[in-house]
């Protein structure tokens, strides 16, 4: 294969070895940049010729691939007098080490990193002239490897016949990949080979890793919060002499929390950790709230009939004077209204009914406002009389009265809220 430039100026030896730096062992006769450019051109052209001869869709040898991988490229040039002008390239051989899993004669997988033949090409016009054997033998001497220890990547039928003719390699070991190895590959190897462990059966596969299985072996007791084991915390001693309650449960540790994740449902840890405090605080809050609401209702005389609250019975002498004055005003106004609107015969009857209802309401107010016993309520009633006793009230507490009584009382007041 001829080129426009002089090949003898960049390849000073018959067979030149190149690595990923694309620098020949002997310095070319031209500038380094120009020599680098010409070497890349040679590699690209011979790679295309090899792909065309092997009927490959793309070339597997190029300058960019050589720079990206740690491969060795042996280039053979023509030194005959007829090409003394510019020279010519006869062929090339590309090799490199690869890590492979190779089957032996027994079918066992063996991990090895042999020297592999990746690409081999001799120009069609110069084949069967001994150039291929010369190039191959030079590579074996330079790499210091035996031919039976090589692995060949997808060899063609011509290449296999070449190996049988010149190196007596006939029997191959079937492989599951695209590489071909011959018998004697595992004999007298200088490079170390390593057998891969046999595949485990399905019964030996477990859902946890070794670390998880060791962790599960340590779970002898019940996980938190079922276990009541006490955990000594070093942080409490370092922060100072803070008092601790004997009845309180120590906070969970990190190990207990991780263990509980395997046995507890979501949010169960949070509910279990705060259940005791929530129950205690809920009971205390409910009881105190109900008691405070009851006292407030008793104090204000709450009712659904929007009547003004009755005054407290224990308000002092000034409050007693106001109560008497209000009582006298109410009695006088009620008496005037009854004399003007009702006949004398019916006034006495209504007055008797009103007095009885007033007495009943007074007893109920006395019981709820002060929270006293029946004996204390009777003494307070004799000592101080509330003006609310003579005034009709809309507040109905305790017993349920009929509608006729309510209607009669509204007629006496001459005021209807509805």
Curated annotation (Swiss-Prot):
This is Alpha-tubulin N-acetyltransferase 1. Residues 277-287 have a biased composition (Basic and acidic residues). HAMAP family: mec17 (MF_03130). Belongs to the acetyltransferase ATAT1 family. Its main location: cytoplasm. Keywords: Acyltransferase, Cell junction, Cell projection, Coated pit, Cytoplasm, Cytoskeleton, Membrane, Transferase. Acetyl-CoA binds at residues 120-133, 156-165. The gene is atat1. It is found in: Cytoplasm; Membrane, Clathrin-coated pit; Cell junction, Focal adhesion; Cell projection, Axon. It comes from Xenopus laevis (African clawed frog). Residues 1-186 form the N-acetyltransferase domain.
